[in-house]
Design a protein with these regions (language model features):
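Generic structural motif
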Residues: 21-23, 46-48, 84
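A short, exposed loop/beta-hairpin motif centered on an aromatic-Gly-Thr core
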Residues: 33-50
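Short aromatic-glycine-(Arg/Gly/Cys) micro-motifs in beta-strand/loop hairpins
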Residues: 8-37
Length: 86
């Protein structure tokens, strides 16, 4: 199942892709809006879930806290195992 694949421990490099709603300021109006944002990363992780957690931790420090992140189980998060680290 997708949940089993997400939590299966395979230490190594992962490519994670995340589509999320990012809050950004529109300079002309001074108001904020949600923008669809695609984020791709290569990271060392223990599982697909760990890859997701690392991505969210990284983004949470860099984007407006009102941004909306999808569930790791949904269609807006994808990952693939790239291989063991050396």
């Amino acid at each position: 199942t997708a949940m089993t694949r997400l939590t299966e421990e395979r230490p190594g490099w992962y490519e994670g892709e995340l589509d999320f709603k990012r809050v950004v300021l529109v300079p002309s109006t001074g108001k904020y809006e949600y923008r669809d944002t695609h984020f791709v990363v290569h990271c060392k992780a223990m599982s697909g879930q760990d890859c997701y957690d690392r991505m969210i931790d990284n983004l949470s420090e860099r984007v407006d806290r009102r941004s909306q992140f999808p569930s790791p189980k949904g269609k807006n998060f994808r990952f693939r195992y790239l291989g063991r680290w050396k």
